[in-house]
Amino acid sequence: MQTFTSPIISTTFAILILVVATVRASVNASESQVEQDWITVALSEAHSMLLHVTLKGKNRKIHGQSVFDVYANPVVSADNTNIHYDAFSSFIQGDTKFTYMFVNGTSYMVESLASDNISSNWQALHCLPSIIPFEHIFPALNNATIVPSASVRGEPVDCPGGSLFQTSFSGVDFVLCVSSGSGFTAYGLDVTMTAKYLPGPTRYTLPALVEEAAPCPVVTTPEPVAPTAIAILTGRSLPPSSSRNLRTAAHAAIEADTCECMSTPRPCIFLHGLGNPNEEAELQDTPKLTKEKFGDIGDHAPCCTTVKYAVLNTVDIGWTNETLQQKFCDFSLSMSETSDLTSRTISDTIVVTHSMGGLVLASALATGKCKLAASTSWVSMSAPTMGSMAGDFLQDICDGELTDVVSKVMDLVGQCPVSIAKKSTYYQNGKYSTPELNAAYTAAQGAYRSNVHAALCSKSYNGVLSKYYPSCLVGGTVIPHKSKENDALVEFQSCLGGLDPDMFGDSYLDRFYSAKLNHADTAFLTHDGLFRDSQKPFKWFECLL
């Protein structure tokens, strides 16, 4: 179930972790005086940087842009022993400008009007929690090794007049070409970042938080960093003692890890969840008419001989509606010529459901409207098999309760009055549920356990950065979920449907995937994370069957 209608609010500094995080020079009595002097001078001459970022690979865009710039300014302590980098980047999409800042270890997003013709000073500042594994930054830089040559996706990395390094950050490999005095370039499978040293800092202004707001949390703190890291950040040559101790490795090759279909290729049908007001009699080739209730799986479906998307009204009709269940069955039966219309058996098909779509199919199976042959695989994401507290919460709001938080959550959970579909997802055995709804949940859970081939259930609303991220952050924290393990709308325990949680793992290679993704991420509306295996929904589907 999902109702995302908020403005676009997104970006990522995750690809910039090699340069825009806080660092502290490690100076202690055991170091030589020469090295101490070198560190002091190097930090005193630290440059501001222009970071030109190019995103590559599948589903790699921020606000629709795969190329953008980030500015990073060094902040050096008075004694030249401590340094951190502040950074910012701006994106314009539609009528809104989004500026992302990393200042004094704290992440912010500033939302403002993009048009100069609009006479308004409106802007809003949002705190962003840590979604970058900062604890791995410094080991990555400190452990960088010199390599004689390198390649990415089989293409050689050219580094004329510079030095090549290889390192790994949170399991992701990078090659760095460092040119003294001019900057460096970091190469990865999904990103290339060129850092150019600037003669002076770039100015920016951080808006003040509203008076009643709590201060934004610090998401990273200084940690020791070795001369190798300082040399990469500042463009200086290493001191002789560090140069002698620097390890050298063999050729560095970063190769793409792709998955091929491991089973019989079959047609795939995608059945969306709650919140789409549109209805189409025919299956669609794209999910455009689903009102962002499903994203495009694109070329992440090696086992799909064809891909179709159903477009059904899931605002005025809830998951217990027999007509809606019948449509789910009819569309699924139409995908393969081997399906048996007489026995209503869906054969040789991959059925993919998201959110309330999983409940619709489970209830259709439980009530005998259709059944799945052994040759059919049902893949479920974020199914609220016990309901969602979002429905109960919206009902509280519409009844006049919780008025102080209405503006924060209405874009996420929906509007008053509560829709029929939203009412159908009242939490099982909750104050708004009924005996009939409770019984329907129990029956659907049994069918779910007996038939689902693979499932993605999330333990965190802190997913990948996207336009849906801030609203999901609100949903995960403001909605009174019964568990902190939720994707903003659906709890992990609700998604389990009675399955053993020990079946689930946090790698995209696990058939039952315990992810850290928000509700939009699990609908393929965003993209894979760059670093964590627990944040790769597209890769999970690509490698699943």
Question: Can you describe what each PLM-predicted range is?
Answer:
Residues 254-349, 400-402:
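Active-site catalytic motif of lipid deacylating hydrolases and related acyltransferases
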Residues 7-10, 16-86, 141, 150, ...:
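N-terminal leader/targeting segments and the immediate start of mature chains
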Residues 271-276, 354-355, 383:
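Glycine-rich His-Gly loop
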Residues 108-229:
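Extended beta-strand-rich segments in extracellular/periplasmic secretory proteins, especially
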Residues 69-136:
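An acidic-aromatic
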Residues 352-357, 361:
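Gly/Ala-rich beta-loop-alpha elbow adjacent to hydrolase catalytic centers
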Residues 366-545:
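Helical cap/lid subdomain of alpha/beta-hydrolase-fold lipid enzymes
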Residues 260-264, 342-345, 352-353, 370-373, ...:
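Extracellular/periplasmic catalytic domains that process cell-envelope and extracellular macromolecules
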